[in-house]
Amino acid sequence: MAHLTASQRDSLVAVVEAVLPAGRFLPAGSAATVDRVDSFVGTLPSPLQRGLGGLLAALDVSALVHGRRTFARLPVATRLAVLERWRTGDPVRRLALRALTTPLKLAHFDDPALYDRLGCVYSTTVRPEPKPAWFSQRVHGKLDRDESIECDVVVIGTGAGGAVVARELAETGVAVVMIEEGHYFDRSQFTGRPFQMQQRLYRRGGSTFAFGNTPIPIPLGQTVGGTTTVNSGTCYRTPDRVLAAWDRELGLHALAPAAMVPYFDRVEAVLEVARAKPELLGGNGRVIARGANALGLVHHGPLLRNAPACDGQGVCCFGCPTDAKRSTNVSYVPLALRAGAELFTAARVGRILVEGGRARGVVATSGGHTLTVRARAVVVACGALLTPLLLADNGVRAAQLGKNLSIHPACGALAEFDEPIASWRGIPQGYMIEDLHDEGILYEGAAVPLEFSMTMTPLIGPELVRLAEAFDRVASFGFMVEDTSRGSVHQIGGQLVVRYWLGDADVAHLKRGLDVLAQIYFAAGARRVHFPVAGFDVLASVDDLAAFRRANLHAWDIDVTAYHPLGTARMGVDAQSSVIDADHQVHGAPGLYVVDGAAVPTAIGVNPQVTIMALATRAADRIAAALG
């Protein structure tokens, strides 16, 4: 089914022809590009679909002002000039062009012919594995009739929180039912095609945003395994200084560093955490190590990961095609099922049952039918953006619910070298630099496939195509910031709305992070560095950093992403300043627990999956004790 109108389609073809011209050996964008965009548009919520139409209408107005014709009727060179005015113009036009060109870049480079011409690996063929007999007895797809069942604990969500609670409880003999809104994909369905898998595995096709003084994408997994299925596999324990602060400032004495060690140990044993193998760090790791050494940095090397059998397929964030990454769809969920838990997929929970003031189950819908699960306890593990909405819909009125959102704002840069990089070979996020971690900046490898790499630069037209044709010599690396800014989540007209205002201190950290990253690149021998920063698209040498340092940057000048939403139902001992207690139970709501990123009290400055899993392991112990 077509999602674009005929006029929108014509306008997008005209944009594609200007943004993506033919290169020395890469073909130009065409109507086929727009065909792929059309399928992507279908994954967007209606407000974003309407926003796309508004952008195209605004483009026509701009064209009429400057060229007295609609955009599609302008010569290609004039179209490019109009778009360049947007690219170098005020923040509104710059952000509008980013929103317009990002799906076009993704769709255009999602083409096996382009990958072949660049020598990249486009997709992966995976041999399917037979499921064990118990699998079909424990996993249920869409319902074909109304059902009502009973258990001890019902868990909503199968990510880093829900899957861990389910496994830990099931292995103690507790009857557990897991309910997951997404589907249970196996590795044979992980094709290695990034744009395709993004639409299949991510909520809204990857188009979840925070809005404030700049739009920030926050991609969320929507599948069994949640975001663990589509994350990088990086494993950090919560820093001791963070745990100590929770103990000292929030009264969470049970989370003191020494108290949490056994839970980290248990999680890491299941995940089989180990350092990334040096031979799989690829060209990115090689040049970053060289640059870091040249600058005298000392705290850098292979990252800890949950993929001991990794062979460097390079598509961690789009479903591991070898099952080497021990995301919860591969580790904790099967362990829970083997221990007797049941799983319902493609089911959405809307109602939490309350009897006598206590949570007693849930009602979910699937395939037009109703699933009622009666239980002694309910665990909500929908993630930091969605858990508050479900709780609010079911009468939880905690003052802090939906507030205190931290996201670890992230940024990255590309660099061109004279040597082969071949970033598609090896672990995408396998290397780290911790020298600036005490400042709140953590560097981690961020090699991404061709189509996503091209969205990391605001370049359009011939310069963009020149960069794409040099992709085998392009490195990418990134970092995240331990944010002091805070946001909130809301539901407006049935739609998730995330608000987040990026503060000056975090903007300064992003600027500092980019500055040091450029120094690392140039020290490693980079010819050019590409920043996602207005006015500083391309740096030709380290001398160009002088102007960058003097620049008074604002949030809207930097393209920022985020992957770690936390804190929207945070833990604490005071019901006025938190949503759940130290046992993960919602204040004033017996039997109702929150076990996911929403529970994490503050930003932690590292990838949070191990933190969430360790807290979930502890939560399972507390829930089991409460059940008796």
Task: Describe the role of every protein-language-model region.
Residues 1-70, 74:
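Near-N-terminal "mature-domain entry" segment
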Residues 2-6, 19, 27-35, 39-46, ...:
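Extreme N-terminal leader/targeting segments of oxidoreductases
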Residues 108, 118-142, 253-350, 359, ...:
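Conserved redox-cofactor binding core of oxidoreductases
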Residues 151-178:
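N-terminal Rossmann-like FAD-binding beta1-loop-alpha1 element of flavoenzymes
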Residues 168-194, 217, 223, 338, ...:
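Glycine-rich loop(s) and the adjacent beta-strand/alpha-helix scaffold that form part
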Residues 196-276, 320, 476-486:
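Redox-cofactor-proximal catalytic regions of oxidoreductases
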Residues 231, 398-521, 554-556, 562-567, ...:
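FAD cofactor-binding and catalytic pocket of flavoenzymes
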Residues 602-623:
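A conserved FAD-binding loop/helix module that cradles the flavin
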